[in-house]
Every structure is written in structure tokens, then in C-alpha cells.
Amino acid sequence: MIPVLLVTICLAVFPFQGSSIILESGNINDYEIVYPKKVAVLPTGAMNSAHPCYDPVTCQPKEKEDCESGPCCDNCKFLKEGTICKMARGDNMHDYCNGKTCDCPRNPYKGEHDPMEWPAPAKGSVLM
């Protein structure tokens, strides 16, 4: 398939800014913003609404933002250490955020082969 080139700004169309979005698969969610010396991959569905973790002009993560999504991410910040991110079921134990990642780490005090460990520990997206 021939890539389609659209001229637009990160999340909205403005005539004064000329960033390029390349749709390689024809799917609006599979795209990259191309700059002279850098490429920013935007979150899935970013074309539909402005993402609060990204600068709408530069399409880059905002300064001092930790994460984009995940069970231990809220408003682009890691949740504080000790916040429950996965409730216990049965005799199981809660999983807690560690304040350093957007993922929900497995409680280290759980048994090695926990029958309640489904689905797998939840993952999120960290901003780099």
C-alpha cells in the first residue's frame, strides 16, 4: 500500500503548522508524526481527542509527565506507592503501585504459582 501523507499538527488541523502524518497501513491509529530530526509515535486514538500528557503543538510528552496510561497512572502521573492497583480475590493478596512505574507489579508476597493470577499483571505506557 502506498503511504498517505497528511499535513496537520499533532492533534488538530491548523494552517500555520506543517507537521506530517504518515498513514502506512490505511488505519488512522497506525501513524507517526515526522519531524526533521525526530519521530514521535502518538498513543492509539490520539487523532480522536487531545491527550493531556502530550503538548498539542510539538506532539511530544509534556515536561514532568510520567506516564500515558496504565493501572498505576492517573492524569499523566504515577500513582503514589501503596495505591491498590489489583484487588485481591479469595485468599489472594492485593497488588500495589510502587510509585515508579505505570504497571501494576505483582505482590512479592504472593505464592510463586498463584492460581488467581489471571489475567497477567496489568501494563501501561511510560513516557520517555
Curated annotation (Swiss-Prot):
Key words, A-Z: Cell adhesion impairing toxin, Disulfide bond, Hemostasis impairing toxin, Platelet aggregation inhibiting toxin, Secreted, Signal, Toxin
Keyword presence, Disulfide bond: yes
Motif placement: Cell attachment site: 89-91
GO molecular function, one term: toxin activity
PROSITE patterns: DISINTEGRIN_1, DISINTEGRIN_2
GO CC aspect terms: extracellular region
Family of this protein: Belongs to the disintegrin family. Short disintegrin subfamily.
Protein name per UniProt: Disintegrin ocellatusin
Protein's organism: Echis ocellatus
